[in-house]
């Protein structure tokens, strides 16, 4: 069973060296840092370090202006060539994308300054493809070449806790879904009066570490199969989900690529 391996602190690019081999890029990304207060300095530095590391690997990173965290738009032209190191995939995989992406704040009732969604943690698994579609980066997995899992910070979360941007809805019955979420995803809540819908409140699950074994796009929906590679914990600060570690699962479903529509979202990495 494949397992997820932490690459350590986001500012440490030493662990990224093996991932840089075979990756080429023509991306030009400008990251601006203006005056900032001490409260935001550390988070911004983590983002800056991580963004630079991603840039070296050919991953699209939006321009960021810290002055008020206003939305900035940048046009990037990126060529990525990933040469397989495995016998099962001899040809290189290249993807050229020209995209307009921006990072900004959503409407919020909070009066406090919120950071945009920023990448704060890198995890190493295995994959053969990174794709950009409808403002999202999607991943296809195999055992051929290295890849990255991305942690993102939800701008609506004031704690700065890293979570997956994911909402999972599986359409095969409430009870089966309930068991799936509790037993395989390690997410459980008892504060809903309707016990049959205990785990289906409108919030994203935060269980990390999946190995994607298949990926396709049909009518703007992502169709995929996945294997759970191991739980890292609900919020990265406790081991409350240790019992779910290395519980294998495989499943296929569709996930809508429009999270703003209130439907399923699958691992949205960078909002465009």
Swiss-Prot record:
InterPro entries: MgpC. It holds the Pfam family MgpC. It comes from the Bacteria. Belongs to the MgpC family. This is Putative MgpC-like protein MPN_102. It comes from Mycoplasma pneumoniae (strain ATCC 29342 / M129 / Subtype 1).
